[in-house]
């Protein structure tokens, strides 16, 4: 395919560019930055764009939109690497390498509460709220470890709000994953001992915890308290399961191992993480549109992005021998993390085996991802034919609403692409209008808010609406008013509101149905079901939040931060009512007068 490229704009900048380090920007219409790149030699790097026959189709298409090129000269390669990362993060150029699942590592946290809870956490550290353990590279590893810890130590996972207001044990107690401190099924001292043992386990002190559990079990047996002894026996068994999860691989030092596999225009970077001598799991990160970039460059950019956030890097990372610029990576990571980090090649047999393991996993993940891409592309091709779309869709948005008799009304949007469901792009809309359960008006508000303001630059290729023929005019009216040209269809369930025999409604077209067992019908049902699931869970969260309202929420003279501090410290409104004025003043850092207002309020349960 031929593209018209503004050769003169590139040649002009080549003439002006020095043979030194820096960053260049490809700029298109309306000064939109299309691409940001770094180079050891700006003149040489830009000259490569004139070798047209060596460029990928994607790069050729990008160059056809370039109006001008700008460069920023830096002192050295490290500054160029960091500047490129900052510009990509702030400008989000559409033609730069896309890293998927570039979120921060997940952690396990234990709250600083009188009866601490254990939870999965991802994001910036909140000083004073939690003890953090990790990071874990894999979310699956966090969930598995959490489950084992719950079975072993029976810590609560409920919110502080629920803990303070509940009157009876929840399902977690019934299935033996919680000791129900909320209703006094365990003493505070015993619960705190369980918390301490959990923390020791997460810090790698498993042998210490095993000795404590064994000693307690033997003591219970001698006292002929066989029921309690059996409980500690089960705890020991679960603790051994936790240890077995990391027996296949271990490493003496905190370290991350990186491997990269490539095929077609996709790369997969695998990360294997060790903390406190334990294997914290691995996860694949996918890199799209990278055919024009060498492995060395992809990995360098990825490392800066990975550790330039809430992620806490280890003192050393291991990379394959193909990575030649180790010193540059070390200096760049030091600049963004303010910690000395060594980039190492494998030397010992164990190090080589771990690098091979992470590479092999990356290769398998890459093959699976490409298979998923192919399958989803086939589904999108079918959608294009059935709904007479102008192009094969790349982004499909599905909409649904949920409410209970007009209360806690929410609308949701789920997104699907060639990768599958794009959960990071889901949105939920709390209905603001006085609509009272009118599905049509709820959909009108949701779509109006979705396509207004700054969201027009992310326009989908197809909309699927959970609704019937009555929704057609509503959707069409919103899109016409906002000058949005997107094809859509409404999907209504069959006669008895069950899956199967769904009918589809579109503007200026007779309604139709599809074979129930066809692949495309099953795919459309999965899209609708995912939107329905997200709508229901969003609605329930909103409903439950309203149900579990603390009496403190009615006090307008103190803010949420102080209310949370009081609930976190005392555990319940009842405990606050028993506290002294001085205690309340100290915890919430408020005046005596305001403390008196709080006590009066919780005593009267106003």
Swiss-Prot record:
Keyword match Transferase: no
Annotated ranges, domain GIY-YIG: 19-97
GO biological process entries: nucleotide-excision repair; SOS response
UVR domain mapped to chain residues: 207-242
Listed GO CC annotations: cytoplasm; excinuclease repair complex
One Gene Ontology MF term: excinuclease ABC activity
Alphabetical list of Pfam families matching this protein: GIY-YIG, HHH_5, UVR, UvrC_RNaseH, UvrC_RNaseH_dom
Coiled coil: none
Stretch forming the signal peptide: none
Assigned keywords, A-Z: Cytoplasm, DNA damage, DNA excision, DNA repair, Excision nuclease, SOS response
Location(s), subcellular: Cytoplasm
Subunit composition and interactions: Interacts with UvrB in an incision complex.
Homology family: Belongs to the UvrC family.
Biological function: The UvrABC repair system catalyzes the recognition and processing of DNA lesions. UvrC both incises the 5' and 3' sides of the lesion. The N-terminal half is responsible for the 3' incision and the C-terminal half is responsible for the 5' incision.
NCBIfam families: uvrC
The protein's name in its UniProt record: UvrABC system protein C
Organism lineage: Bacteria, Pseudomonadati, Pseudomonadota, Alphaproteobacteria, Rickettsiales
């Amino acid at each position: 395919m031929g593209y018209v490229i503004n050769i003169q704009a590139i040649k002009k900048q080549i003439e002006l560019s020095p043979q030194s380090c820096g960053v260049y920007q490809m700029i298109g219409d309306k000064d939109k930055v299309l691409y940001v790149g770094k180079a050891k030699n700006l003149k040489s790097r830009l000259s490569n764009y004139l070798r047209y026959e060596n460029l990928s189709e994607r790069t050729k298409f990008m160059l056809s939109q370039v109006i001008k090129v700008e460069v920023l000269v830096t002192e050295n390669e490290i500054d160029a690497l960091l500047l490129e990362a900052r510009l990509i993060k702030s400008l989000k150029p559409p033609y730069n390498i896309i890293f998927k699942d570039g979120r921060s590592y997940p952690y396990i946290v234990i709250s600083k509460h009188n009866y601490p809870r254990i939870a999965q956490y991802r994001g910036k550290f909140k000083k004073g709220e939690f003890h953090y353990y990790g990071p874990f590279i894999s979310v699956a590893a966090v969930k598995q470890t959490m489950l084992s810890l719950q079975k072993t130590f029976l810590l609560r996972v409920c919110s502080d709000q629920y803990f303070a207001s509940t009157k009876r044990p929840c399902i977690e107690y019934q299935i033996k994953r919680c000791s129900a401190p909320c209703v006094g099924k365990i003493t505070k001292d015993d619960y705190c001992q369980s918390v301490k043992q959990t923390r020791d386990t997460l810090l790698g002190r498993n042998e210490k915890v095993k000795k404590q559990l064994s000693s307690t079990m033997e003591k219970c047996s001698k006292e002929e308290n066989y029921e309690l002894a059996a409980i500690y026996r089960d705890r020991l068994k679960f603790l051994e399961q936790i240890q077995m999860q990391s027996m296949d691989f271990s490493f003496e030092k905190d370290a991350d191992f990186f491997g990269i596999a490539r095929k077609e225009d996709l790369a997969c970077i695998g990360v294997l993480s060790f903390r406190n001598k334990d294997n914290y799991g691995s996860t694949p990160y996918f890199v799209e549109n990278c055919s024009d970039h060498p492995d060395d460059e992809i990995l360098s950019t990825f490392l800066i992005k990975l550790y330039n956030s809430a992620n806490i890097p280890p003192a050393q990372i291991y990379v394959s021998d193909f990575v030649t610029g180790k010193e540059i990576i070390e200096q760049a990571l030091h600049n963004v993390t303010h910690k000395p980090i060594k980039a190492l090649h494998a030397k010992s047999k164990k190090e080589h085996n771990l690098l091979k393991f992470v590479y092999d996993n990356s290769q398998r993940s890459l093959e699976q991802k490409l298979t998923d891409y192919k399958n989803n592309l086939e589904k999108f091709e079918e959608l294009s034919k059935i709904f007479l779309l102008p192009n094969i869709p790349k982004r499909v948005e599905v909409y649904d609403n949920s409410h209970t008799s007009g209360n806690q009304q929410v609308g949701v949007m789920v997104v699907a692409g060639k990768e599958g469901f794009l959960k990071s792009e889901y949105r939920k809309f709390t209905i603001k209008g006085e609509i009272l359960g009118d599905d049509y008006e709820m959909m009108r508000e949701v779509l109006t808010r979705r396509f207004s303001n700054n969201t027009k630059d992310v326009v989908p290729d197809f909309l699927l609406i959970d609704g019937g023929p009555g929704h057609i005019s509503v959707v069409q009216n919103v899109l016409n008013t906002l000058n949005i040209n997107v094809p859509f269809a409404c999907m209504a369930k069959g006669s008895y509101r069950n899956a199967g025999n769904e009918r589809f409604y579109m503007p200026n077209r007779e309604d139709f149905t599809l074979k129930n067992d066809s692949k495309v019908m099953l795919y459309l049902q999965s899209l609708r079901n995912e939107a329905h699931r997200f709508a229901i869970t969003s609605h329930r969260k909103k409903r439950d939040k309203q149900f579990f309202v603390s009496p403190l929420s009615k006090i307008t003279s103190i803010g949420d931060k102080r209310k949370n501090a009081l609930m976190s410290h005392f555990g319940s409104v009842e405990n606050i009512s028993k506290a002294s004025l001085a205690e309340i003043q100290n915890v919430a850092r408020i005046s005596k007068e305001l403390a008196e207002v709080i006590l009066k309020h919780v005593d009267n349960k106003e």
